[in-house]
Amino acid sequence: MGVSVLTFHVSLFLKRILSIAFFLLSLSTLLRIVNAQQYVDNNIGSMVLSDYDFAETPSVRVQRALEILRYYYEQEDVTYEEIIIQRNHAIELLRSASHDNNTDAMLYLANIEFFGLFEIIPEIEDSVKYYDMLQKANGSAFANNMMGFFYSTSFSEYASNNPALARIHWELAAKQGSLDAHQFLAYHNLIALNMPQSDEEAVKHYKFISDHLFEEECGSNVTYLKCIWPEIQDYNFAGENGMGVYGAASAYTYSDAYQALHTRSQYLREMSNSIEDWDYELMFEVAKLRLHGMYKYPRNYTVSDVLFRKVSRQYWPYTSENSVLANTPQSIISLAAQSCGYLGLLHLFDKGPLFDIDKAYWWFKRGATKNDSNSYYGLGYMAYHGLTSNGVDREKGMRLINLAVMNENPHALMFLGLIRLEEARYEEAYHLFLRAATQKSVISYKYLADCYYNGTGTSRSMISASLYYKKFVEAIRASATSMAIALEEIDEYGYFHNSFVYYLYAAQMGYALAEINAAYLMDENKFLINSVFRYFNYTQSEQEAAHDKFAYEFYSRAAAQGDIDAIFKLGDYYYYGIGTPKDYSKAYTCYKIAYEQSSIGMGLWNMAYMHEYGIGRDQDIYIARRLLDELSSNQNSYFPLKVAIFWINIHQLYIKLLKLLRLR
C-alpha cells in the first residue's frame, strides 16, 4: 500500500541478488553431491552388506552403525566421499536390523529419514513407515506422537489429514505419560483444532502437565530459582536478524525476548572495554539476563553474582553499611539497592555453591535501607521462617512482606497469597495471585489456574483454568520443546526443512511463537514486492497457493493467541487476498487491533491509507490526516509522515478542484 517507485526497485534488486546467491549456493551443493554420488557408484561394492554383517545380532548391527556414524562425522581428515560411503553402510546396517524387528533401528531410521540427519535427503514416506512400524512393535510413545503429528498436519500424501487417527495416536502416547501428547491434545481441544472444542478435555490435559512440572521442575517449592526467574524465550527466526516478520517495524521488537537480545548485543560490544568503563545500567540488565538465561545466552548465577556486586559497590564501596559514596546519582543508588535484593535472593534460594543465609541477610539489610522490594520480601521471608539468629518472628515477617506487597513485588504477592490460602481466606488469595500474574510471576499462573479449576475464591471457569495452565506449561517447558533445535538448525546449518518441521511440531503443541515462525518459513510474501504482485492478480502455481493457505492458517492461529505481528500480517493477507479472499473490512479491523494493542505505527499508517482512498471505508481525507497526525510522536515515522501529509494535501486540493469543476 502506498508503494514508492524507489522502494519497488530496491526490493526487486535485493530479491534478484538473493536469488542469484541462493542459485550459486544450490549449484555448489548439487555439484558436491553429484561428485560424491559418482564416487559412491564407483565404490558400491564396499557398501554391500557381507555375510559377516548378517551373522551379527540386530543389536550389534545397530551398535556398529552408530559407531560408524559417530567416528566418520567426528574425523576431520576423512574425505566427504568416504563419509558418504560409510554413512550409507551404517544406514544399511540399521535397515537390516529393522527388518529383524529391532525397535532401536526403527527409531533411528525414522528420525534420520524424517529430519534429514547426516546429510540425507528427507524421505517422508520412509519415516512414516518406520514410525508406524515402531508404534506397532512396542507402542512407543514417541512414535505415536509423531504419527499423530503426521495425521494432524497433512504433512504429506503418505499421511493425509486424519484427525481421528491423530487423536488415537496421541491418546495412546498420553496414557504412557508423554507430556508432548498431553500438550497436543490440550491445545487441539482448547481451540477446536480438528476435534470438537472441549474446555473440560483441555483443562484435564493441561492440569496433568502442570502438576507434573510443578513437582518435577519446581519441586513443589515456589522459591525454586528457575521458577522465580524463568527462561526468556528467544526462539524467533522470523524477519531480518530475528527482529520479527516486519523487521525493525515489528511489534516483536518491544518484547522481553528482543529487549534481552538487544542487551546481549550491547554487552558483546562492551566486552572489548574494561569492566570499569561499562555503563552500570547495562551491567545491571546483563546480570538480570544471566538469572533468566535464554537460548543464545544461558543462565549463569555466578556471573550474575559478580555483576550485581560490581553495581552495588557504586554506592556501597565497603562492607560497612554506613560507608556510602557521596553525591551518587539517584539512578545509581536505585540500581545498587536492586542489586542487593537480587544478591540476597540468590544466596537465600540457590541450591548450589551460592547458598549462604548469612550473606543473604546481609544483602537484604543493605537493599532495605533504600526501600528495595526484593530486600523487604527477603527479610520478611527470613523472619517469618526463623532463618536468622533472632528466631521466628512472624509479626515482623508479615510487616516486611506487606511493605513489599505495597510495591507490587511478585514474590511477596505469591507468599501472602499462599498464607491466605492456608487461612482459608480464598478470595484474598485469588486476588493476590491475580496481582502477581500481572507482574509475570510464572508460579502465579499455576495457582490462578487451580483457583479457576476448583472454584477457589472465584467462580469455576474451565476456559480460564486452561489458559493459565497453558501459560505456566509453556513458560516452564519452552526449553524442552523443539523450538531451540529449530533455531539451531537454521542458524548453524541453514537447514530450512528441518527447522520448519521443528517449528511445526511446537506449533501443534500451541506455542504462538512457533506458529508464526512456521508460517513465516512457508510465507511466499515476505517482501513488499511479493504482496504487490499478488495484489495485481499475479498468476501463482499450485505450490504457492498451498503455501499461502498454510501461512494464512498459522498466522491466524498465532493472531488468535494475541500475537500482534500475526494480527498485522493477517490484515495484509485480507488486504491482498493471500490464502483467503480479499476482505478490506477485515484487513482494516486487523490493522486497528494491531495499533490499539501495541501502538504499532504501520497499523495507523495503513488505516489512514484506506480512509484516504476509500478502500473498505468511506473516503475521508480528514480522518486520514488525523490518523497520520497521531504518528507525529514516532521518530521512525518522521520523514515518511511528512511526505504522506504533503501528498494528502495535494490529494485534498485535487478533490476540491474536481468539486469546483463540477459546480461549474
Swiss-Prot record:
Glycans are attached at N101, N138, N221, N300, N371, N454, N537. The keyword DNA damage does not apply. SMART domains: SEL1. Sel1-like repeats lie at residues 141-178, 179-214, 337-372, 373-409, 410-441, 442-477, 564-599, 601-636. InterPro entries: Sel1-like (IPR006597), Sel1_AlgK (IPR050767), TPR-like_helical_dom_sf (IPR011990). It comes from the Eukaryota. Keywords: Glycoprotein, Repeat, Signal. GO terms for cellular component: endoplasmic reticulum membrane. Residues 1-35 form the signal peptide. GO terms for biological process: ERAD pathway. Belongs to the sel-1 family. This is Uncharacterized Sel1-like repeat-containing protein C1B3.10c. It comes from Schizosaccharomyces pombe (strain 972 / ATCC 24843) (Fission yeast).
